[in-house]
Every structure is written in structure tokens, then in C-alpha cells.
Amino acid sequence: MNLIKDTDQEHVCIFGGDYIYRMDISQMLRFHKKREADLTVAAIPVPVSEARHFGIIEVDENLCMTGFVGKPQISPRTMPGQPYMLLASMGNYIFNRHPLEDKLQQDSQDGQSVHDFGRDVIPKMYPGGKVYVYDFSQNHIPDAQPKEAGYWRDVGTIRSYWEANMDLVGIEPQFNLYNQQWPVLTYNPPFPPAKFVHFSYFRTGHATNFMISPGAIISGAMVKKSVVGCNTRVHSFSHVNESVVMNNVVIGRGCIKYNSSKGVETIHLSQICNRKSTNENIEHICIIGSVCVSCNQRIRVYLK
């Protein structure tokens, strides 16, 4: 509360930190001001079949919030004019300062509250306040492709984190990091450029549909459809496919690291093994970080 009270700003923006998306927040703020809202919630359209995975917001024809259902088992009210689509909350909010202060103060004195925005604070605002929903799919980003509109990923699980990384490596990626009109700014570590070494028929550093970070060396190995972190070494005769390799990893000679994640219920977080002992039927998501693996080692970590 002190962070809000110590400022004289009229609006307070609260955005989730474990999501991936590209957004011009000023467009949402203009929407908020135009409707003179106390609260504006960002949402994405999702098919009715996916409702159980999200918190679903119900709205009227003016996008005024009329209800909220957390991960419903039956279909709630659909979007006006779109009978097969629902609005899923993104966890991004713009508040007017004074209504937010009032509701937080009330919530702090509620012994039954768990002090969660989605569960406790927002449901107390929309029945009597001016709460609107901003359709994120209408947010315009310069030079973005049509299929990028509304891209949003929750990366709060291992599977969703892996899927978001795989979204980056396509020829025409769903989330394009190469948009010079709207770059994604990040820290660049002081490592040299990535390097591919060895050139022979059976031993060539080779990679396709991949993203590789500074300081990485692909030494006579093959990397396909993967994201490779900084200061990583992949040694000769190793294969890395559909995987996320974190920073400072060493993969020894003759290792295979791959993914085949169709229809998986038990997720193997990582498996690196010698090619001769690989079970080709094993299906898993492959993520590895901060380890050194050599030939004939097998690592298997299960997600409970």
C-alpha cells in the first residue's frame, strides 16, 4: 500500500510476471480512460473448449464486466456476437488509484479473504463499480504479423515453458523476436558469439530451426528445433532435438537429447543418454540446466 500512497499518480498498473506476450500498454490505458473505468482487466478470446484452463470473464455488449468464473467445468456466458468464444483473464489490470486503495483496505480487514486479486479483490469491484474488459487481440503492434495478434502464453508450468520456447524456433515464429519496430529488450551477457566447429562427413557442427545464445559452441554435433543457452557446449556426435538447454550446460560426446511430447501425461523433464541405449518410444519434454553430462549417463527427472 505504501507504494501506492507514496505517489500522486492517478492510475496503477498491475501485470503478471510469468506470462509471455508483446503489448502496447498505452492502448489499454486509453481504453480505460475513455470508459472512465475504475478497473480494466485485459483478456484474450479463447475457444469454449479451452474454458477449463482459464479464469473466464463474462461481459455485456459494452465490454462491461458482469461475472467471473475460475476454470469452469461448464461453459459460462460467451462473448457478445461470438457464441463459440470466451474471454480469458490475462492477469493484467489497470486501476484507478482511489478505488483500488478502498478495496485493498476492505480486503485487509476481511478474515475470510486470502488476499488474491482474482479471487477476492476484483469480484468485490465489478458488481458496484465500473469494471471493463480490454480485448488484447485488438492491441496493435507495429510490424507484427496477423498470426501474432493476441499471442499470450502462461509459462507457470514446465510444459508451458517448453511450448513457449518451441514457439520461437519456427521459420515464421508465433512470437517473433526479430521485430525491429517493437524489440524485446533483455540483458546480453559479455560472451563471444556462438561458434560451430568441425567439418567432415560424420562430424559437422550443424543446426536448423534453432536459437543459440552467445558463448555456445556446437562441436561436431547436431541441434534441431531447440533453444540453447549461453556458454553451453555440445560435443561431437551428440543430437539435440526439440529441447531447451539452459545456460552453462556441457553435453558430452555421443549423447542424444530429444523430445516427442504427443499425448504425454507423465512428463520426463530431461533424459540424456547414449544412442545405443535409447528407448525410441519414450515420450517426454526435454529441459536441462546447469549440469555436465557424458556418454552412457542417463538422467530422468519426473514432474509429480
Language-model-detected regions and their locations in the chain:
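Unchanged
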Residues: 1-172, 264, 296
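Left-handed beta-helix
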Residues: 97-98, 102, 107-304
